[in-house]
């Protein structure tokens, strides 16, 4: 049974911290293929890999994926998936889920959740969050934090610790980290990437701030399952390989 949404996986080879990470293997299967397999388990109408790299494209075609070759000039994965939407035959209201290419253990239920959330909100974008479990995570600038309204719409995203506990600097209660999984309406996605970057976005290096800056809302729900680690470094890959061995022995 397929659900009424599409998954597009932006797949960039030249990652700044770990070039070629999507072609690294976890128990004989590349990271990008594992992401693709997890996306299929969410039962979308389609799964497309968007890349500008020949080797990624060739490997994806070999394991049966639909591939769209995109420009090598894109600055973000969102720009890359928008090119796929612009080239395709998507309806304006089609739900497009952006699944990062470096999440080999992305939970299918989270993909379904973020897509379903978009169909139940007037916001043009939906995403997820998860409670922060330590002060170290809260203070890590590589972990994006989010604060929301009482009706689950984003007030702000930041690399800083938000909200700031003035009277207890060791507290991290009621703090949430953002999960970089998005669902967009196709028409809004194309509109979004046409806007120039805003000042806050450039300061924080967080493109979702462009949406809030422009006066649109982002629906944020707490994930139904705890998200697993993505792969940003060689150390993350080693942890992912060990995690696979651990779950294989359960």
From Swiss-Prot:
It is found in: Cytoplasm. Its EC number is 2.7.7.38. One of its GO terms (cellular component) is cytosol. One of its GO terms (molecular function) is 3-deoxy-manno-octulosonate cytidylyltransferase activity. CDD domains: CMP-KDO-Synthetase. The keyword Cytoplasm applies. Pathway: Nucleotide-sugar biosynthesis; CMP-3-deoxy-D-manno-octulosonate biosynthesis; CMP-3-deoxy-D-manno-octulosonate from 3-deoxy-D-manno-octulosonate and CTP: step 1/1; Bacterial outer membrane biogenesis; lipopolysaccharide biosynthesis. It catalyses: 3-deoxy-alpha-D-manno-oct-2-ulosonate + CTP = CMP-3-deoxy-beta-D-manno-octulosonate + diphosphate. GO terms for biological process: CMP-keto-3-deoxy-D-manno-octulosonic acid biosynthetic process; lipopolysaccharide biosynthetic process. The keyword Transcription does not apply. Keywords: Cytoplasm, Lipopolysaccharide biosynthesis, Nucleotidyltransferase, Transferase. Activates KDO (a required 8-carbon sugar) for incorporation into bacterial lipopolysaccharide in Gram-negative bacteria. Belongs to the KdsB family. This is 3-deoxy-manno-octulosonate cytidylyltransferase. It comes from Legionella pneumophila (strain Corby).
């Amino acid at each position: 049974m397929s659900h009424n949404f599409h998954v597009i996986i932006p797949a960039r080879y030249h990652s700044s911290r770990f070039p070629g990470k999507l072609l690294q293997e976890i128990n004989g299967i590349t990271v990008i293929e594992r992401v693709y397999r997890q996306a299929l388990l969410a039962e979308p109408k389609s799964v497309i890999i968007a890349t500008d790299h020949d080797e990624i494209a060739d490997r994806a075609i070999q394991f049966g994926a639909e591939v769209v070759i995109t420009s090598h000039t894109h600055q973000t994965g969102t720009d890359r998936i928008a090119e796929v939407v612009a080239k395709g035959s998507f309806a304006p209201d089609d739900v497009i889920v952006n699944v990062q290419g470096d999440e080999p253990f992305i939970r299918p239920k989270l993909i379904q959740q973020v897509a379903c959330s978009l169909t139940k909100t007037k916001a043009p974008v939906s995403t997820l969050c998860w409670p922060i479990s330590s002060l170290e995570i809260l203070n890590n600038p590589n972990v994006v934090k989010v604060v929301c309204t009482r009706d689950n719409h984003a007030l702000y995203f930041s690399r800083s610790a938000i909200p700031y506990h003035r009277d207890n600097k060791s507290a991290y209660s009621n703090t949430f980290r953002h999960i970089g999984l998005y669902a967009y309406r196709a028409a809004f996605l194309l509109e979004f990437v046409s806007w120039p970057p805003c000042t806050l976005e450039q300061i924080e290096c967080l493109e979702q701030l462009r949406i809030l800056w422009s006066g649109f809302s982002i629906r944020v729900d707490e994930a139904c399952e705890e998200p697993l680690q993505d792969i940003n470094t060689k150390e993350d890959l080693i942890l992912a390989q060990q995690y696979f061995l651990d779950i294989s022995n359960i």
